[in-house]
């Protein structure tokens, strides 16, 4: 999922000069190709997530599409007030990406768990939440995630997730619509 995200991000950035990427001092292995190709559109905010989100809002209000990238709960719960006050209330074009949703970074302790992130962001006005199940769904949601105006949140796995969908079956994905895994009547 993470590699699919970065590939789609790079493709989008080539066609949209307004796109910038902000990270919280991590992800360099997977983000290196973006950093190399777009050095003027990459910012490392350091380990200061709240300032990172405020910076993203400022860039967005100046006309940029800003992607904020971090792990676990750091781009969400750590800076929920900044997302609410600086991004959501101003309908800033900020795209928040969490890598390692749920307990993926569990061995690092509960400070790295991202279990309440989706429900917290769903409470904020106008925030769209995307939670793809696999790389195929990640690719399908990247277009709407990046191109639709306003605040959006993308929650993806760290890598190695099983592929549940055929990418062709997801062509024409529409934001806000469910993607069925299978049809059947066994449940009723």
Predicted regions and their residues:
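Thiamine diphosphate
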Residues: 1-178
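Short, intrinsically disordered, charge-balanced linker/junction segments flanking boundaries
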Residues: 181-188
């Amino acid at each position: 999922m993470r590699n699919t995200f970065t590939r789609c991000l790079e493709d989008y950035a080539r066609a949209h000069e307004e796109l910038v990427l902000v990270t919280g001092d991590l992800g360099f292995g997977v983000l290196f190709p973006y950093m190399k190709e777009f050095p003027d559109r990459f910012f490392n905010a350091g380990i200061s997530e709240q300032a990172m989100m405020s910076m993203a809002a400022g860039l967005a209000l100046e006309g940029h599409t800003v992607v904020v990238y971090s792990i676990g709960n750091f781009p969400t719960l750590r800076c929920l007030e900044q997302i609410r006050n600086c991004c959501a209330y101003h309908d800033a074009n900020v795209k928040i990406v969490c890598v390692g949703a749920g307990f993926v970074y569990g061995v690092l302790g509960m400070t790295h768990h991202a279990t309440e992130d989706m429900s917290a962001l769903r409470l904020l006005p106008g925030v769209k939440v995307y939670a793809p199940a696999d790389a195929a769904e990640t690719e399908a949601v990247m277009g709407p995630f990046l191109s639709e105006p306003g605040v959006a949140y993308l929650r993806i796995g760290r890598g190695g997730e099983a592929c549940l969908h055929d990418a062709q079956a997801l062509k024409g994905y529409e934001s806000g619509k469910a993607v069925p895994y299978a049809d059947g009547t066994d449940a009723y």
